[in-house]
Amino acid sequence: MTTPRTVEAGSGPVQEARSIFSPATGFIRRAGFAWTCNPYLGCTFGCRYCYAMYLPQNRRPISEWGRWFAAKRNAVELAQHTAAKLRGAAVYLSSVTDPYLPIERRLHLTRGILEALLPFQPRLLVQTRGPLVVRDLDLFQQWDAIRVNVSIPTDDDAIRQTFEPKAPPLEKRWDALAALRQAGIPVGICVTPLLPLARPQAFVERLLNFAPEVLVVQEFHESGGRFGADTAPAARELAARHEGHAAAYAAVCQELRRRGAVFFEGEAGFFPPAVDEKRSRVKTICPPR
């Protein structure tokens, strides 16, 4: 892997990247994506269960995860030069960072990449927990095949603050989902991993009432040794302190099935959007695992 040259900017680190679109690997490739796109390295949301802190792209100590980011300052220029090769391809935005970190409000790297991609209409999946995503509704509405996944791992903001200390509040994410839905953009809700819940039955009811195009749930997991795929040990230890958490996951899945909900468990739910899914509003259906 080629390491981009790091330079210092007045307000923090930026990097000169050699490419902005990388061939998909791992579960993202298995899901059917050809490319990933990461405008930033690192992440300031600081999720304690994040697999990305263990990946080779993170060259900082694990203890510093959530305290830093690096912006690829030439990301938009690179996207403009290479977007044509992604015509119609499946693109995952983003795999090792969040495309809507707070700094994106000022830097506009993600928006610039979207503007470069738009004429070539790749099948785009946006993965975020950042409410800033609604800023780009005008671009999403011009896409033929798009889905925006928003992470909603719990119903309890105190739990969110424990596991995702710097991530946006849950209600702001629900507000973003509502705005996306109002704009006609297909959405996915990712309960991945499922964190401890305050009111499990009410949480299931809210998921069902919203009825996202795709619903994904996943428990804390271990991969059996594949580098970087495990849920962070610190997060598993936190979850273990909440009595009955494993049983709660099974109960949530059982209730979803009892209510006839179509949902996916784990990586099975991360698949490219279908062409014209936005306009047809046809749900992609797969039997529960």
Regions found by a protein language model. Give the residues of each.
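Auxiliary Fe-S-binding modules of radical SAM enzymes
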Residues: 2-16, 22, 199-289
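Conserved Radical SAM active-site core
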Residues: 2-147, 156-158, 170, 182
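Active-site beta-loop-alpha junctions enriched in small/polar residues
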Residues: 96-98, 129-131, 151-155, 192-194, ...
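A structural motif corresponding to the C-terminal end of an alpha-helix
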Residues: 116-122, 175-187, 247-266
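Non-cysteine beta-strand/loop elements that form the S-adenosyl-L-methionine
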Residues: 138-155, 213-226
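A short acidic, glycine-rich active-site loop
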Residues: 65-73, 167, 235-247
